[in-house]
C-alpha cells in the first residue's frame, strides 16, 4: 500500500467545470440544489459519498498497521484460497481483476457504511482531481441546454479562451465526431485528455460553424469567489481543496481594501474537502493555539489547533456564515469552530450533519480504499453527526432550489402516483403556474398545467410530462435560480 491519508469523503468531478440540466451522472442517486449559477450536486442521507474531509497533515494518534491474529490470518488465507480456486479451476475463464474487485467491494459493502468505498484507478484520478482542483483540459464551463452542449464561459486565461471560444458557442463535434445525443459527462471525457495534446472542437456560433484546435493544459479551478454587494463583501467558498485557505485570505484582504466591514462567507452546498484547509481557514479568524476540531477514535482524542496568529485585517470584520443542508463535512468543521468561538453568526438552514472521518489508502495500481476510521467534534465538544449545525438565524431556501432531479427517462401522465410528481408541481408553482396542491398524484388539473407549460414554451402539447418537457422545465428553473438568490438577498438586507 502507498500513501495513507485520513479523510471524510468527496468525489467531485470537475468535468471541465461542467454543469448540466439532466445528464450529469454520479455513482448514486442525487439531489440538486438550483443555486445561483449552476446545478450543484450533493448526495444526501444514506447514499452520500461526497462531502470529503481529507486529513492530509495529521497522523491520528500515531496509528500503525497492527499484525493479524490467528483468526484473522485464517480468514485471509481462506479468501486467498477461494480467489486462487476460482481463478484457476472454474470451468469458465475468469478476469482476475474483476474477481479481486468483487471481493473488495463485497467486504466494503458488508460495512453498511455509505462513506466507505473502493475506487478504481480511474475513479481515484477523479477523486484526486477534486481534492486538488487541478485537471487537464481546455478550461471551458459547459452545460447541456435544449439537447445541445453549450459553452457557458471559458475560464480566464484558459486554452479555450485563448483559442477564441466564447460564451454560448454550441459544440457539435469533438475531433470530427458528432456528439449529438451524448450526455454532458461523455462530451467532457472526449474533450479532456493528456497534457499538451490537441483536441479539435467544431463549434456553431449563430449560422457559422468552424473547427477550433485547442491544446490541453493543466487547469486549476478556484474554490473561492469574492464579490462586493453594496457595503457587504460576499465570499463564496465552493469546496475545501488545495490552497482554498490562501484564496480565502486573498478574498478577505480584497474586502478589507474595499473598506468593507461586513462579510458573508457563503458555504451553501459546499460538500467539504481537505481538513487541513478548514483548519487554516479557521485560523484566519481564530488566534494561535486554539482548537479547531477534535478527532476521536475509541478512547483516544486529538485536538487539532491553529498554528498562526489570526489575520489582523479580519479582526474587526463582522463575519456571517451562510449555510444550508448541502453544507457538509469540512464546511461544518469550519462553521462549528467559528460559531463556538463567537467569531461568526450563522444564517440559513441546518447543515447536513456529517461528523465522521474517513481514511484513504492508495494502492500501487492506482486504486484506493476509503473507510470510516474516526469521528470529529467541534471545539466545544459538539458531535453534529446526523444532527447538523443549527443556524443562529433561519433563512429558508425556496422549495424549488432544493428539488430532486426528475429522471428524463420517465414520462408522467394522468393517473400516475410518484414522488417526482410533487417535484413537478413545486417547480411549476415557482415558474408562476397556479398549482392547487403538492400531492404525488398526476391529476387532470396538473395535465392542464403541463399543457399550458408546453404551449408557452413551443413544445408538443400532449399533457404528459415527457423528456422534452422535463428538459425545458429544468432549464427554466436553473435560469430562475441564477437570476434570483433570494436567501442571500434576505441576508444582505438583514445586515444593512
UniProtKB/Swiss-Prot annotation:
Segments of this protein annotated with the region Disordered: 1-27
Composition bias of kind Basic and acidic residues appears in 1-16
Which molecular-function annotation in GO is an example for this chain? Answer: serine-type peptidase activity
Mode of membrane association: Single-pass membrane protein
Q: Name one GO cellular component term.
A: plasma membrane
User: What processes in GO biological process is this protein linked to?
Assistant: proteolysis; signal transduction
Classification via Gene3D superfamilies:
2-enoyl-CoA Hydratase, Chain A, domain 1 (3.90.226.10), 2.30.42.10, 3.30.750.44, PGBD-like superfamily/PGBD (1.10.101.10)
The record, for NCBIfam families, names: prc
- Family membership, please give it: Belongs to the peptidase S41A family.
Which protein are we looking at?
Probable CtpA-like serine protease
Q: Which organism is it from?
A: Staphylococcus aureus (strain MRSA252)
Amino acid at each position: 500500500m502507498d500513501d495513507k491519508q485520513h479523510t471524510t469523503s468527496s468525489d467531485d468531478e470537475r468535468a471541465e467545470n461542467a454543469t448540466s440540466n439532466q445528464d450529469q451522472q454520479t455513482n448514486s442517486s442525487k439531489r440538486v440544489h438550483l443555486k445561483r449559477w449552476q446545478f450543484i450536486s450533493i448526495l444526501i442521507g444514506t447514499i452520500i459519498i461526497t462531502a470529503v474531509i481529507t486529513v492530509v497533515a495529521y497522523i491520528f494518534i500515531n496509528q500503525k498497521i497492527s499484525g493479524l491474529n490467528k483468526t484473522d490470518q485464517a480468514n485471509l488465507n481462506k479468501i486467498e484460497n477461494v480467489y486462487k480456486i476460482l481463478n484457476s479451476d472454474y470451468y469458465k475463464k475468469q478476469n482476475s481483476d474483476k474477481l479481486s474487485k468483487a471481493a473488495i467491494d463485497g467486504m466494503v459493502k458488508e460495512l453498511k457504511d455509505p462513506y466507505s468505498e473502493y475506487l478504481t484507478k480511474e475513479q481515484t484520478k477523479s477523486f484526486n482531481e477534486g481534492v486538488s482542483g487541478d485537471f487537464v483540459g481546455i478550461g471551458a464551463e459547459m452545460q447541456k441546454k435544449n439537447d445541445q452542449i453549450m459553452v457557458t464561459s471559458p475560464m480566464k486565461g484558459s486554452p479555450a479562451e485563448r483559442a477564441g471560444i466564447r460564451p454560448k458557442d454550441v459544440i457539435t463535434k469533438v475531433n470530427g465526431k458528432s456528439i449529438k445525443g451524448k450526455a454532458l459527462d461523455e462530451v467532457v471525457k472526449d474533450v479532456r485528455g493528456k497534457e499538451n495534446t490537441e483536441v479539435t472542437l467544431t463549434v456553431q456560433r449563430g449560422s457559422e460553424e468552424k473547427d477550433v484546435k485547442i491544446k490541453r493544459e493543466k487547469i486549476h479551478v478556484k474554490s473561492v469567489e469574492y464579490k462586493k454587494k453594496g457595503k457587504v463583501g460576499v465570499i463564496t467558498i465552493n469546496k475545501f481543496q488545495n490552497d482554498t485557505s490562501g484564496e480565502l485570505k486573498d478574498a478577505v484582504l480584497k474586502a478589507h481594501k474595499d473598506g468593507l466591514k461586513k462579510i458573508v462567507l457563503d458555504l451553501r452546498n459546499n460538500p467539504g474537502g481537505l481538513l487541513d484547509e478548514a483548519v487554516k481557514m479557521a485560523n484566519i479568524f481564530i488566534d494561535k493555539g486554539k482548537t479547531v476540531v477534535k478527532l476521536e477514535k475509541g478512547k483516544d482524542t486529538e485536538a487539532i489547533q491553529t498554528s498562526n496568529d489570526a489575520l489582523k485585517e479580519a479582526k474587526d470584520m463582522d463575519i456571517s456564515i451562510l449555510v444550508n443542508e448541502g453544507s457538509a463535512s469540512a464546511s461544518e468543521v469550519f462553521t462549528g469552530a467559528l460559531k463556538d468561538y463567537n467569531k461568526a453568526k450563522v444564517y440559513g438552514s441546518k447543515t447536513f450533519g456529517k461528523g465522521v472521518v474517513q481514511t484513504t489508502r492508495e494502492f500501487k495500481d492506482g486504486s484506493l480504499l476509503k473507510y470510516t476510521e474516526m469521528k470529529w467534534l467541534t471545539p466545544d465538544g459538539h458531535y453534529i453527526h446526523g444532527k447538523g449545525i443549527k443556524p443562529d438565524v433561519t433563512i429558508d431556501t425556496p422549495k424549488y432550489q432544493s428539488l430532486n432531479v426528475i429522471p428524463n427517462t420517465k414520462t408522467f401522465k394522468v393517473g400516475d402516483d410518484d414522488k417526482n410528481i410533487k417535484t413537478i408541481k413545486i417547480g411549476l408553482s415557482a415558474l408562476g403556474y397556479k398549482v392547487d396542491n403538492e400531492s404525488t398524484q398526476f391529476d387532470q388539473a396538473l395535465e392542464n398545467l403541463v399543457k399550458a407549460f408546453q404551449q408557452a414554451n413551443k413544445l408538443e402539447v400532449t399533457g404528459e410530462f415527457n423528456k422534452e418537457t422535463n428538459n425545458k422545465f429544468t432549464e427554466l428553473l436553473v435560469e430562475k435560480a441564477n437570476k434570483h438568490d433570494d436567501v442571500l438577498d434576505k441576508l444582505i438586507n438583514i445586515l444593512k
